[in-house]
Amino acid sequence: MVAVPTSMASLQAPPQYVVADIDLADFGRKELSIAETEMPGLMALRVKHGSEKPLKGARIAGSLHMTIQTGVLIETLVALGADVRWASCNIFSTQDHAAAAIAASGVPVFATKGETLDEYWAYTHRILEWGDGGTPNMILDDGGDATGLVMLGSKAESDSSVLDNPGNEEETALFASIRTKLAQDSSFYSRIKSNIQGVTEETTTGVARLYQMQKSGELPFPAINVNDSVTKSKFDNLYGCRESLVDGIKRATDVMVAGKVALVMGYGDVGKGSAQSLRGLGATVMIAEIDPICALQAAMEGYRVVRLDEVVQDVDIFVTSTGNFQVIRHEHLIRMKDEAIVCNIGHFDNEIDVASLKDYSWENIKPQVDHITLPSGNKIILLAEGRLVNLGCATGHPSFVMSNSFTNQVLAQIELFSKGDKYADQVYVLPKHLDEMVARLHLEKIGARLTELTKQQADYISVPIEGPYKPDHYRY
């Protein structure tokens, strides 16, 4: 090894990444290469837009699970001209070899699997801190944490009392990180907020946050709701969860699903996919729902629709997928049968009241798998500490379905960055013709061939031959 003179070493900037092991980069690169073959939408966008660089000048702060599939998304954004900084949106979802591969390519990445809450918020701050002292001008979010950090931080600049009463462990870490940053730079967040041209949001929970800000008149920039693109919600949420839920449960527990009684709480698109996956492996599946329409859908599919408090003692596998909080509360947890498996596939960890279990005896079996002894003497198996089981205990959705979602993300970033001045400070969805384009880009990969309308047929149903084929109000 050649020694670096002290004078030279002092001039070297610290690495613009935090990853578990940069030596995993080669492994990550091999998996990225395989994933690219399963992500035709993203690869098509590289071909279509690579020469024109529609994202040149975009500074994208990305907060989304740092997986292999996300690596393909990041490199697509870079290929289209963007400058990108990235953190994960979940403390357990990072694939360390993926983070290493992207960091080794020169993209600043701040993500490790199993990071602490303090580290999580420190890393989220890092994606907002451009090396030249500048700021991001775009946010690509999953769950709304990056957007929420900017918004809460800007409020705290003028009223620090918003940080006085954290409601849980997560908020304690978040509020402390904001106080630390404000002590260093009292206008950090408002400066970033004023420079953001737009936000694209990946998931149901983050979209709900955006609509809340819009309703209260607090949304300071336009946002695109990627989640409600048909080629996202009806594919990622449904078919992705149909494969990744049981992958996470089985990797974590090696349990035989056949013959078990499972309860899926929430029968939206995520719940529908989750229920199908468990039924497909032979479980008896029940559904808990608050929405009469979703409940009726579940009943018509042959599922028993039940109340949690009436069946809790009979269930072997609990899955929350509601986007709400304290869906499974302490009063339910303490009544569970011995060796019941408890997990969540909604975005945040508060669907299950994990905090109420902290004083009980915990035995860690392996990463993200804990045995908890209840007052009754029964033990339950908690997966991923109540966070996303498919990413905490497995590797998330398959590449092909994520290509649908991430193609929407790239199109949304291009739209807001290049045409942001045409958008008011509201939440939008991508137009139907782009939704259909995303679907078209994925058909050839799976050998699907579209039938084409004749002009007479198109005229008869009053649609263009090339689409769009459905009105915006159509429910797929």
From Swiss-Prot:
GO terms for biological process: L-homocysteine biosynthetic process; one-carbon metabolic process; S-adenosylmethionine cycle. GO terms for molecular function: adenosylhomocysteinase activity. Its EC number is 3.13.2.1. Keywords: Cytoplasm, Hydrolase, NAD, One-carbon metabolism. NAD(+) binds at residues 203-205, 237, 266-271, 289, 324, 345-347, 390. It comes from the Bacteria. Its cofactor is NAD(+). It is found in: Cytoplasm. Binds 1 NAD(+) per subunit. HAMAP family: AdoHcyase. May play a key role in the regulation of the intracellular concentration of adenosylhomocysteine. Belongs to the adenosylhomocysteinase family. This is Adenosylhomocysteinase.
